[in-house]
Amino acid sequence: STLVGMELLIEIEKSDDIPCLLKTIKLCGIKVANITINDAPQGASKGHLEVRLSLLVGRNFDASHLLDELAFHMPVVKFEEL
């Protein structure tokens, strides 16, 4: 199956949630090609983090499935496909 690149921007409330975020992504069978963490995103609440992910996903991947999984484990402030 062909993998395609996908860019996601996820805003989370605290850095403690990063291990959970990455674990959940891995459990969904998604490969992370690159991750950038911005600890002072513009327009975000104090202490929030912006995590930009370059992912390799299957062609029929539905990002809303990942959002549902993440939201089950942690507060997701923003979830955006770039």
Question: Over which residues does each language-model region extend?
Answer:
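Canonical alpha-helical transmembrane segment with a positive-inside/aromatic-interface signature
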Residues: S1-I37, P41
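Generic structural motif recognizing short loop/turn segments at the entrances and edges of beta-strands
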Residues: V4-M6, G47, P75
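Conserved short beta-strand edge segments in small beta-sheet-based binding/regulatory domains
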Residues: K31-N38, L67, F72-L82
